[in-house]
Amino acid sequence: STYKIYDALFGLEEGVITPQDSFIAWNGENYPFEAWNADQTLQSAMASSVNWYFQSVDEQLGASDVYSYIQEIGYGNENMSGDFSSYWMESSLEISPIEQVELLTKLQNNSFGFAPENINAVKDAIRLSSSDTGTLYGKTGTGRVNGQDVNGWFIGYIETADNTYFFATNIGADSDATGGNATEITMSILSDMNIWK
């Protein structure tokens, strides 16, 4: 699900969604999470990690455009050979924590050269909280295989008055490897390092 940051950016760059209008109507299908069973905007879809929203963006982009963007930004192994509806869900597209941080750095300073308003729309969608310390941006991800949570992610960055701190936490286990657990670990470390209070 951390890939959704970039999928949103591709959709914005191609005008499938815009910073002013990112609405996509719910198709009425019953999903396992209540928050998914409603119309969505980029903000709500990112906050609740609504798979169907990003699948809809992909469908409107088309596989060749998505692949071009994945290559352009250098996302992980750039492998889209898995099913087009799920290539980023514990499938062919893979990325390492180091690669996650490298991409977040490029997002934060827009070395992609994308439209600034599109970069800002994605940043707004992943802004989690602000404090006296600074502003926290992030996205969780949970990979499920055979009904077990085996791959948990929390990636993001903290902007302070004088620095930006990037992070990517990935936990793998036979079960309970969730984005929520990755978030707890990350925030504990950032607190211990006096980066976030």
Regions found by a protein language model. Give the residues of each.
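Active-site SXXK
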Residues: S1-F23, A45, F167
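Soluble non-cytosolic domains of exported or imported proteins
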Residues: S1-T2, T18, W36-Q40, S44, ...
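Extracytoplasmic
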Residues: T2-Y3, P19, N37-Q40, W52, ...
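Active-site-proximal loop and beta-strand segments within enzyme catalytic domains
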Residues: E13-Q40
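Surface-exposed patches in mature extracellular/periplasmic domains of secreted proteins
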Residues: P19-I24, D58, E78-F84, S111-I119
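Solvent-exposed loop/turn segments at secondary-structure junctions
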Residues: N30-Y31, W52-Y53, Y75-N77, S85-M89, ...
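Mid-domain, small-residue-enriched loop/turn segments at the edges of structured enzyme/sensor domains
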Residues: E34, T41-L42, S56-L104
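Structured C-terminal helix/loop/strand segments within mature extracytoplasmic catalytic/sensor domains
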Residues: E59-G62, T105-G134, T140-K197
